Amino acid sequence: NLPIFGDGKQVRDWLYVEDHCDAILRVFEAGIVNETYMIGASNQKDNISVVETICDILEELEPPVRTNSYRELITFVADRPGHDIRYAVNANKIRTKLGWEPKTGFENGLKQTVKWYLSNAKWWNKIFKHSYKFERLGNKNSNWLD
């Protein structure tokens, strides 16, 4: 299953990791001490759209075997407490003052990310097998602080 909390309409601003790293380097190189620079790509997408796009990319790269479509695996579950409806920033300052712009579009960055996960399953499966159990961390019933 691919659990979607609530209706999946929570919005996030998506930024490819290499673009994020480039932005941080740009701040180190040209930023003014004690100034704040918000980093964002203005790629605001709701969670359900992102999951559906991942499903579509997977169908192209690794067609499903046990189902007709990866989208059939999407399951809506109860929303988590305090689930913010939107995370996005105004990144105009880093663009205008430091000349930084993201280079990787949303779809291309997501496809590169999915390809990486498909090519490196042996590496990341070890992490999930031995530590993270896909449980919700930080809820009132967890004992992660014990």
Q: For each predicted feature, which ranges?
A:
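C-terminal substrate-binding subdomain of Rossmann-fold SDR/epimerase-dehydratase oxidoreductases
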Residues: 1-146
